[in-house]
Amino acid sequence: MELNMPTYNDQIEEPTDGLLLMGKLMQGEWSIEHEDEKRDHSSEHSLSRVPLGLTLEDLEQSCKSRENLLRSRNTVSQNAGNSLRAFKDKPTNSQSGSLIRNTEQQNRQLKEKLNFLQEQNASLVSQNHSLMNKIDCVQTELTKSRSRIRYVESAIGARAMRLPDLEERILTLEAKADAQENALRTTEDQLEHSRHILAEKERILQMFKDEMKALKEELFASCRLCKRTEKQRNEALFNAEELTKALQQYKNKMTEKMEKVQEEGELLKNKFSNCEKEQDALQQKCVMLDTELEKSRDALRNLQSENIIRQERHQCVEAKNAELISLLTQSNQRILRLESELEHKEKALQENIDENKAMKDCFAKSKQSETISDQPKEQPADSASDGSGKLIADLRAKLLIREAENKELQAELVNGKLLTNRYRNSLEKNCLDALEAEPVKLNLQNTAEEKYLQLELLCKQIQMDKERLTDCVKELQGKLGKAQIELTNTKLSMEQRTSQLQLIQQELLEKASKTTKLEQELVKKRMKISALQKLVEEKSQVYSAAEARNAGLEEKLKNYKDQIVNLEDNINKEHAEVLLALERSKDIHQDQQKELMKQIEHLQLQLEMKNLHAGEQKHTITILQQETLWHEQQLESVNHLLTQARKELEIQTKNTSAAMKSLQNQVEVESAKVSQLESALTVCKEELALYLHELEDNREQFENQIKTKSEELWCLQNEIKLRTQSLQETSEENVRLQQTLQQQQHMLQQGTGRIGELEDHHTELEKQVSKLEFELEKQRSMSEDMLQRTKDSLHAANKELGLKTEEVQELCSTLNQVKLELKHTNVTLLQMEEELVSLKNKEEKNASMLKLLQMDMQKTQVELDKKACAVLELEEKLHIAEKDSKRTEEMETQLSGMQKELDGYTKQVEELQETLTKTHLSVEEKQVIIQGLTEKLRSYKQELEERDHEVLDMDQLLKDRNWELKQRAAQLTQLDMSIRGHKGEMEQKIIRLESALEKAELEARDHIKEISSLDERLQQARDQLCEKEFDLMQKDQIINQLKKDIERSHQTVTDMEKTLKVQERRISEKHQDGVDLSKQVCLAQERMQLTHQELLETRQQLAEAQKESDRLAQKLEGMDLISKEKIQHLKQKLEETNDTVCNLKTELQARNEVIKATNEVLILKESELTRLKARISSYERTLGLKQLSDTTALPSISFTDPHPLDSSKHPEASDFKMWHISPSISASNLSLTDMSSLELPKSMLEDLRNLAPPDSPPMKDTSEGVSCVSSDSLNNSSFNPLTYALDENSDFTDCPDLTTLTGMLKYIKKEMRLSEYPQEHSPSKAAGIDGGSLG
């Protein structure tokens, strides 16, 4: 660049430049005063943002800036002196306030002056650099002009006429050169002075940097503290939310319990009324059943007697049937014989009939012969008639015998027909055949026919009797079948009852053992509950202390939040300043491009002027035109190569070929300046090497930090994986435990169902339902105590809720304050934006002023060009032109290289802009996240308010329900008072036992409820674990995003390192080619300055990137700490859950033992119930026997037991005998003898004694001193089977017979004895049983 100082050329333009500089200084001071407050907040960036590059604006400032500096210093010193004098003159009372104010004002003034001095130093440095560049240019021009003059003097001797003019011009040029040398010396002095000032400022900068490092460390510590406080606050909020949830659950549980208690009270009332109704109905049923039993027993006895008679009759009938069958067989045989005899007799009869006929004929013949032979023949006739009379008598005897035999046969046939119907027809046929066989006899003998008719009538009567008897037999057989069916049914019912009694006995034994175990476990659990209450009190104390700590931490949080807000404001301001700096850098680049274009245009104008001068000097440059044409051809070839570059540079190369011809004489002067520039370049390169070395060190440190943090992240990821695996295992274990819990709950439900069924049976069998009211009183008292406790706990919870609501309100107020501060910061930001707009307007004004100054500079440059045209007239040699052409080619190659470098730099600038846009996007995303968090906070506040309203509603409902419960309790107490009057002394023992039973049942229910609550807690813990796992997943995602961001930053850093390496290579290439860069050093310097600025900007961006990486590293460290703390918290919670699971296991085992104990107790009670049932049956039997005794007569007593007193003396022997006596024995003796064997309670024995008739002898019993109870007491007070025990001494030697009731009772007694002996762990119950037996 061919620029010279305007002050040495034209003295006319000095005042205008001075005025402009003064105006500019005034504007700078005014802008400095407005930007002091900003620079106080962002001192770090203000120090790092000193303009280190040179621009054309700095060339327009003159040396008057130093005078202004001196004037300002003098004014400051005068002001300071005046302030000190004024301070000395002031009185002592206002010394402290004035001192503080003066010191503050002085500090402000010093800060302003420091900033002003820094800017002036920067401007002086830039001016020095510009002056050095101008001096170098002038020196190069002088050397060129001198060399050209020498060349012209040696070459052209004919032009001696122009020598004096040229000498004058040379003298003027030398004078100008001397003046410029003097200016250079002064500028060198200024440079030395500015270097000293720079050294001091660098020392001050190092001090400030150290202070900034300390401030950064403090900021990092404060950020960590803020994060920790935020974590603690979040944990406190989370704990508060958990407590609110727990309170809501507790309230829900309490309401459910209260509702259940109310429902149970109502159910108990209903049950009580139902029980009373059922009791009355049962009593009526018992009376009806007693009557029915008596009737059924009478009917059974009648049936038994009838059965016996029927059996006897049946036996007789069977005997008769057997006899009849034998007779039938005999009759059949006889019939066969008689048939054979009848055939013989028929034959004989026919023979007799023939003989009779013959006799009749003979008789007729004899009569005729008699008549013929009168008297002489009388004697032989008498003899013949005597012979025939004998024959007739014999025949009649035979007929009579046969008739008798026929009658016998007919009688036998009738008997056979009565027994069987088979032989009736055959016998009748035989009889008819027999009767028909003798028609002659019947006709002859009327007596036989009459007898036959009588026999037929007898047969008919016998048949009628037979039919009647068969009907009776059938009826008797039907009755027998019914009786047998009834007997089988009774046997089956007896067997079922015996089996039921055995089962009930076993269940009662199990329930008794279960109740004992439940009582033991209840004692243990009461101890545990007391210990837990102590732990709860200790935890409440710890919680109160933690709340106090939380309050202090919240105050600290507020302070830290204020600091964070201030820091965020500072960060936002710095960010805005960075954006402004980037915009300024962009504007500067654009201005530089515009300036370069203007310089190119200016050079084009210069070239046009030079072409005009060349037209005037065509005579002197005819020889050079050929060479110029040759050079133009070469330039055209170079232009073809540089088509990718700018077209304007091709025009510049064409015009520079003509311009370099006139600058051949200045090469010698420029060589010296080139050496100086080379030394400056070496210094710059050394500085660049140092900067690069620092960059490499920083890069290595950053890489090492990234490696360490990546290793830490890897370790953390491994830990998180292990933790997730452990959490999964614990979740699986929890699932298994839940399954076991569900199974055990199912078993408990089954056990409770069985217990309920047994209780139902027990309540059905028991008749003393009225005694449950005493237990209701106890339950009410217990429920009132529980209600009072719950009220106290609710009051405490309400207080805690009030405190927490106050804390929430305080947090809301803090949030509102934060919102107000945010609004205030937004307002301040708007103000700052307005100030930035005003500053931009001022900068535009300054730019217009700079444009005016540039116009002035252009005018001075035109004048310098005019002066140089005079020198160009002397340029005529061709050798130097050839060298210039070569140099132009080299410069063109260098220009192409520099253009490529500029392209690379533009690419780097674009990449940096992309990184900035990415950072802006990340900042915007963070702002969006902050907005989302604020919205979540608002939603959480709304939810807390809704929960507070719900809690208030629940409190009102609880109060209403408590009032209703109190009213109901009062009503129940009145009912209890009315019921207590109807209770007796005998009921108290039963009430105690039943109260213990129901307490155990209630405690079992409470345990079940506790198990359900523990299940709910387990589910809540699982939900919390799921939420924490979700949070861990989110954190893992955030860490992955941060890793990606770090990788991107790594990529950007690697890209920057590559660009730095490329720049180093290019710098080395420039160092190699620095010797050849003689003519375009100014352009190279400007470009180097641009590169230096870009390097500084890159350094700033690298510093910002390092800061961002440090911030990310700090965030990662914070996240690591948070994750570690959360992992520790999760570990603690897991340990707590494991402890709770172990406790649950132990509690489940204990409850299983309790359930077993209750089952054993229930088994015992069921056995006792079986005993009672047996005794009730014996009691009913005695009553039946008593009623039988009233009906039977006294002689039976004397018949069965002639010694009743002896039997009463020996009850056991009489026992064994009396159960085997036939039912005909009277029951009165049994009532006297079997009382001791039945083992009835003493009240029932005395009732029986009272009911016994006065004639019966008195009973003797071993037990004495028994209180007599009337029969009304039996009706009023129900019978309790648990108040007495078995007599252990009454044991039989022989085996019991289960077919009889005594055998069953003996068997039950033995089983009870066997069940009572192994129960060594419950001596109190055995003592109670013994006491009952004694009482």
UniProtKB/Swiss-Prot annotation:
Q: Which residues form a coiled coil?
A: 92-1183
Keywords assigned by UniProt?
Coiled coil, Cytoplasm, Cytoskeleton
Annotated Basic and acidic residues bias? 1313-1323
Instruction: Give the principal location in a single coarse category.
Output: cytoplasm
Q: Which GO terms describe its cellular component?
A: cytoplasm; cytoskeleton
Provide the protein's localization.
Cytoplasm, Cytoskeleton
The protein's name: Cytoskeletal protein Sojo
